[in-house]
């Protein structure tokens, strides 16, 4: 996620304090799939399904959820002080030792809590992230994002002209690196997604940066220090 230009843009937006005081955050990754691969022999099946073995795998949190968890700390600008979690095998009772459903809670300084739910048993609402502040909430889905302002939130000015989408009874202000300020009210985030220059997946940008850093080593080191620090 840190390689995605759209998320880099969102971090700058978040750091301006546009959502007010941080309250909480939550995210999910839902996909109904066994996570199991077929193989011609039992021996080969065990090898290629290493993700289901707790002795070899970091499980759903480590193999998939780690990216959303990292995004939370990145956006909040904090490291968690405590983490609690629970998991169980609800559907795929096929001998695996890794759970198919996990919930965890991260506690940050100031009493801020961030929850994360991940399951292989249901696909509803797929994956997304929510961040809640005293003035607005931020929803991130893939390469798109929306801000939902509170009625008593101060005016930022540009949001009057920004494009908007309706979600049930809420109106989200469309946030994207090339179309946030001084854009027309007509249209929607979904319509503009195809024109978004940053519409590739985070994996695409991560691989692109990897190839670049393989040739320009020093800039890669500098980027890492800028993002993660030199400790």
Cite the ranges covered by each PLM segment.
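Active-site beta-strand termini and strand-to-loop segments that position acidic
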Residues: 105-110, 133
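C-terminal helical cap and adjacent loop that interface with cofactors, partners, or active-site loops
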Residues: 63-80, 84, 94, 101, ...
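A short catalytic or substrate-binding loop motif that flags glycine-/basic-rich loops and adjacent residues
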Residues: 96-99, 108
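Predominantly a Rossmann-like dinucleotide-binding segment in NAD(P)-dependent oxidoreductases
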Residues: 1-96, 104, 128-130, 137, ...
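Short, mixed charged/polar active-site loops
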Residues: 111-115, 137
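Short beta-strand or tight-loop elements
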Residues: 100-102, 112
């Amino acid at each position: 996620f840190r390689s995605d230009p759209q998320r880099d843009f969102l971090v700058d937006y978040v750091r301006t304090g546009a959502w007010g005081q941080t309250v909480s955050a939550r995210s999910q990754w839902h996909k109904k799939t066994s996570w199991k691969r077929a193989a011609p022999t039992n021996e080969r099946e065990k090898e290629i399904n290493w993700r289901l073995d707790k002795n070899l795998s970091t499980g759903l949190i480590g193999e998939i959820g780690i990216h959303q968890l990292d995004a939370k700390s990145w956006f909040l600008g904090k490291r968690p002080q405590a983490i609690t979690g629970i998991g169980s095998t609800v559907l795929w009772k096929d001998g695996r030792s890794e759970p198919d459903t996990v919930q965890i809670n991260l506690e940050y300084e100031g009493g801020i809590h961030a929850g994360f739910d991940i399951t292989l048993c249901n696909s509803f609402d797929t994956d997304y992230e929510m961040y809640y502040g005293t003035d607005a909430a931020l929803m991130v889905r893939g390469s798109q994002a929306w801000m939902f302002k509170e009625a008593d939130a101060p005016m930022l000015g540009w949001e009057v002209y920004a494009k908007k989408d309706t979600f049930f009874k809420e109106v989200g202000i469309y946030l994207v690196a090339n179309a946030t300020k001084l854009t027309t009210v007509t249209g929607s985030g979904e319509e503009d997604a195809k024109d978004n220059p940053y519409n590739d997946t985070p994996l695409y940008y991560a691989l692109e940066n990897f190839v670049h850093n393989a040739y320009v080593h020093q800039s890669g080191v500098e980027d890492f220090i800028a993002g993660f620090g030199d400790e």
